[in-house]
Amino acid sequence: GGYMADANAGFANTISNYNPTDNWTNVFMKSDKIIPVIYTNYKQLHQVTDDPVILAVGDIIKVAAMHRVTDTYGPIPYTQIGQDGSLTVPYDSQEDVYKAMFKELDAAVEALMPNRTNNFAADADAIYGGNVEKWIKLANSLKLRLAMRISYAAPELSKQMAESAVKNEVGVFTSNDDNARFDSWGTDGNPIKVAVEYNKVKTHTNGTACTTAAGDSH
């Protein structure tokens, strides 16, 4: 096994010279940036509003970002993490992180369901334009994703969470039109976009393209 591409943009790394680095362990998820950014904004959100819809959306975004961190590193600071993103707190096991995320997603859906037809300001939502039902679908789909990922480790909990997600009245993603996608350029890019932004695989000496895709979304 080995690497198929440099971890950094610009093709200026050492992989092409068969000198692998450990950059994939820090560039792929950028947990040093995700955690402080998520929790700093999460704190600010709670300071400026008590709207249950907006706060539920914030919880969904937090889970969407943080589950990738725990899937990469296993134990992470989560339930006791400071709102400033401090890492100087005890780590939670991945089992405890997943259980906390299930509770947060359930609470978010519970808060959003009574407001499913009451869309909020479109200019406050760069992903779904204020469409509350889309956020419910995202929460259910994240719940289903997490359930599938523990199907061997905790089959009973996996079954319970998966069935709960798909049986919700709003349901889960059924097409790419449901995807949570945020297009951004310049300095406002997602710190993990380098992992998915160039989805082209070439093999053989003639550079034949085996697969080609673009972008990533939930």
PLM regions: where:
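Structured, solvent-exposed acidic/aromatic patches
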Residues: 6-218
